[in-house]
Amino acid sequence: MITLFTMERDYPYGTLRSTNGSKTKVVLEEKGLAYQTETVSPGAVWKKLPEILAKHPLGKVPWIEDGDLVLYDSTVINEYLNEKSATNPLLPTDPAKRALARAL
């Protein structure tokens, strides 16, 4: 099972979320892949705590763990997830249309 590490925290005035983590969550849902979410505190990310840096060198969210594979950077993660499962492809097969979709 894939584990998505992202940042989310509720405050009295609203919720702080990782936009990139939210994008990855949408991809996981659209692809129908089994996953679990682990919430990382904003302070741990902002301070680049050693336990975060031990997971990957950038110390940012989101990142995923899929078995022994650890990926970070939402674009890389989302491309991997799209290619991992042929179900519900997220990009067109035509190269020009695919490039335009990526530009969005």
Give residue spans per PLM region.
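GST-like domain detector, emphasizing the conserved glutathione-binding G-site
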Residues: 1-104
